[in-house]
Amino acid sequence: MGPAIASQNKIIELVLAGANGFRLNMSHGSHEVHLENIKIIRGAEKKLGIFLPIVADLQGPKIRVADLKDQVIDLKTGEQFAIADRQKVKKAGMKIPNNFIPVEYPEIASDVKKGDILLFDDGLMKVTVTSVKAPFVNVMVMNGGILKSRKGINLPNVKVSQPSMSEKDKKDVKFAVEQGVDYVALSFVRKPEDVLHIKKHIAKLGGKQWVIAKIEKPEAVSNIEDIVKVSDVIMVARGDLGVEIPAAEVPTVQKNIITVCNRYAKPVITATQMLESMINNPRPTRAEASDVANAVLDGTDVVMLSAETSVGTYPLETVSYMRTICSEAESHCKQDDMRIRRSTMGLPRKEHNTDLIATAAATIAENPDIAGISTLSLSGETALLISNRRPNTPIIAMTEFAEIARRTGLFWGVTGVLIDKAGGTDFTVEHMKQFLKKEQFFKTGESVVITIGRPLVARSRTNMLTIEQIP
């Protein structure tokens, strides 16, 4: 979300062009602005009669240059500078030196050592640490440039001591829970404990939001399997990741992360600079089209746009191109090969039958006589597991809860719908069939796979599969 699309009509246009959900970047804008955007999205949702997931993307422990008060710093190659947090310098009773870069990072002198590299503004400027004399870190400029206020700082291969959630993040999480957004994205995840910590924090606030772990640190790449196990969704955040690790490694790291997510049946989002040139141009480059297509072929569940739609000149065209590229890639993707690859990758089996039912549903749907799959779900888990098997047919996830219908918006191939609570098993199956016909998901006479959990009164896990004809 951003000023380029901040109206209900724009949101509706984007959804009709192919958008499935929207992200609020908590690094920018006030809670008042985000609240207005939430109202716009929910209004569009109501008009269209669909469910749109909203992601609150936390800033995280992002290290930044302090406010320079409308000034800039000219970093010239070979020059020496001192870096420190202003408050730390003040507490130490020391003077600010001439060549000084103020940063919002009190622990910088504790975390870095001689020889470490610091990158400014997404790696455009580079300095190396020559000495550390707390509270100052002395550096020499390797690659110069004009450094502006609030620009980001990356410390490749440095284990920073900042907590996974800042005070700002905690306020933003509280806002997200109060406003009922569907997902919370945690930035700069380093270890599984970071994810468990925010989950506990959300639960204390009474929230049930799923957590998206953003992978953008080398430490997270090293811990990827453990992070995936405890996360609900993973985001391959290639912006900071491509600064923290060599750019040449990003494609293979991306493929590995997606593979691990597929193995554990966790949705994965591929993000950042996917159609970057469309911020100012009405069509993407060939390389960008290939990038999006390859993410799809790798097995990503979601592809995400950022500045292209938030501040870009051609947001509608960008979404339209994205949808076309994804559809074209999937039309050439051998879904049966993808299912075989996933089923042989050692997917951890659940302690219940849901996993087996999901596999059976996707396998049966390979039959050309099957028009689709519909699952009655209280949590969305069955829909997610079926989605992971990549059937060739639509997946309709029916639920009593709007928040679950919205959650499924980030599941590959799944449409979430709200259905009234029904009685016994036979009545429920009939009710589902009538609903699918009424909403024109399927036609009279078409066969669909239906999964439910019985007994319904016990709200059991999915344990029943039936093949039914639409009346």
Task: Identify the role of each PLM range.
Residues 1-471:
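Non-catalytic helical/linker scaffolds that mediate oligomerization, partner binding
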